[in-house]
């Protein structure tokens, strides 16, 4: 019984210590554009991409490190950013749709 309780306590402690993404920003997809076209977040924060357009779109990093896959009208997709840097991204369905994310250090 003590072993089970100890194991459960360790599991709870590990889950509590695990970092969880912090809410960040929202990028809307409308009129074949990302709005805003440039946005900044901090390491550990998220961006939620919301498709407000009639057409399906993606939000895809130029370096292919992340991809929302197809988002239909009204669908959302959230991504957490783990390292600082400048990220260019685009829509694979409409390559002329381009935007930039600046991820700043958490401090």
Label the predicted regions:
Residues 2-107:
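Extracytoplasmic copper-binding redox domains, predominantly the cupredoxin/blue-copper superfamily
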């Amino acid at each position: 019984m003590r072993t089970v309780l100890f194991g459960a306590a360790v599991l709870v402690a590990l889950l509590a210590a695990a970092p969880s993404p912090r809410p960040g920003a929202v990028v809307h997809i409308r009129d074949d554009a990302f709005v805003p076209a440039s946005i900044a977040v901090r390491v550990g924060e998220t961006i939620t991409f919301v498709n407000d357009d009639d057409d399906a779109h993606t939000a895809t990093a130029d370096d292919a490190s992340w991809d929302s896959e197809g988002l239909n009208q009204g669908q959302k997709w959230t991504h957490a950013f783990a390292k600082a840097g400048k990220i260019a991204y685009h829509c694979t369905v409409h390559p002329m749709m381009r935007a930039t994310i600046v991820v700043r250090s958490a401090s």
